[in-house]
């Protein structure tokens, strides 16, 4: 699904939740890219203890166990827009008795002001509609001196898909992610202090164009317009796959992402 002006915010969030609900059972089997990003993000944690940790966009809980082990929190908050993702996470970590599973929108957090020592989020905030509003909300719930550590997709992700579609039609088939500079400007405008940021190109490789697209769909991140879009005919879809196949090299079919890794902090004095 593409985010367009004619899709209301509520409708968009409902569709997003349904998409990730459908992917909840297959997510872990296809989340190779997500695991690579998570490992790098965890290495950027600026603290070794935190009383209250919010895992924003927890999904199936890939980060929950690691955060709990490393930070020894008194309270974990696993928050996601998808109820089915939370169900998988809660079953997976049923032994974490200090963990609360919350189905909510990241842009409207049902949390008290200054309640969290750390907000951790891997590959979730790219689905938010207003980054500035999101960061203001994170500023609100973070304690003075607390941290926001996140990764997100940035402009230039999945160029292989855009290239394969080029010339076949004039439509956007990949979500237009925010430019890294604009993302950092939003963080600064929220009054969070930007401590560090990295923009990295991460490439994954597949046996076929179909398997590359499947890897998106099975984690709920299918952004190909043909997914439920009757305007893409079978013949046009076949033409797309043939164009994508032309990008094969000795490693296979590429699918690459621009990933922003960010550490920010709420000032101690505010």
Swiss-Prot record:
InterPro entries this protein is in?
Answer: BioC (IPR011814), Methyltransf_11 (IPR013216), SAM-dependent_MTases_sf (IPR029063)
User: Which Pfam families does the UniProt entry name for this protein?
Assistant: Methyltransf_11
- One GO molecular function term? malonyl-CoA methyltransferase activity
EC number(s) on record?
Answer: 2.1.1.197
Superkingdom, natural source: Bacteria
In its UniProt record, which GO terms are filed under biological process? biotin biosynthetic process; methylation
Q: Which pathway, metabolic or otherwise, does it act in?
A: Cofactor biosynthesis; biotin biosynthesis
Catalytic activities: malonyl-[ACP] + S-adenosyl-L-methionine = malonyl-[ACP] methyl ester + S-adenosyl-L-homocysteine
Keywords assigned by UniProt, alphabetized: Biotin biosynthesis, Methyltransferase, S-adenosyl-L-methionine, Transferase
**Which family is this sequence assigned to?**
Belongs to the methyltransferase superfamily.
Q: What HAMAP family has UniProt attached to this entry?
A: BioC
Q: What does this protein do?
A: Converts the free carboxyl group of a malonyl-thioester to its methyl ester by transfer of a methyl group from S-adenosyl-L-methionine (SAM). It allows to synthesize pimeloyl-ACP via the fatty acid synthetic pathway.
Q: What is this protein called?
A: Malonyl-[acyl-carrier protein] O-methyltransferase
């Amino acid at each position: 699904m593409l985010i367009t002006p004619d899709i209301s915010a509520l409708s968009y969030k409902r569709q997003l939740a349904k998409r990730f609900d459908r992917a909840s059972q297959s997510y872990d089997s296809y989340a190779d890219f997500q695991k690579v990003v998570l490992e790098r993000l965890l290495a950027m944690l600026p603290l070794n203890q935190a009383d209250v940790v919010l895992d924003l966009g927890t999904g199936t809980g890939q980060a929950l166990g690691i955060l709990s082990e490393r930070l020894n929190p008194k309270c974990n908050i696993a928050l996601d827009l998808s109820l089915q993702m939370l169900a998988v996470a809660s079953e997976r970590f049923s032994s974490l008795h200090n963990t609360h599973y919350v189905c909510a929108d990241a842009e409207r957090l049902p949390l008290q002001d200054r309640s969290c020592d750390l907000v951790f989020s891997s590959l979730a905030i790219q689905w938010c509609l207003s980054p500035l509003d999101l960061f203001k909300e994170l500023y609100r719930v973070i304690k003075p001196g607390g941290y926001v550590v996140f990764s997100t997709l940035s402009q230039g992700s999945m160029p292989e898909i855009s290239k394969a579609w080029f010339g076949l039609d004039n439509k956007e088939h990949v979500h237009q992610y925010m430019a890294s500079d604009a993302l950092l400007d939003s963080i600064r405008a929220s009054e969070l202090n930007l401590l560090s940021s990295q923009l990295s190109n991460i490439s994954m490789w597949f046996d076929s164009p179909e398997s590359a697209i499947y890897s998106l769909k099975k984690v709920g991140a299918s952004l190909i317009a043909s997914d439920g879009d009757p305007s893409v005919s079978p013949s046009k879809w076949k033409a797309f796959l043939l164009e994508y196949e032309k990008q094969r090299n000795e490693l296979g079919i590429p699918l690459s992402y621009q990933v922003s890794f960010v550490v920010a902090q709420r000032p101690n004095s505010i």
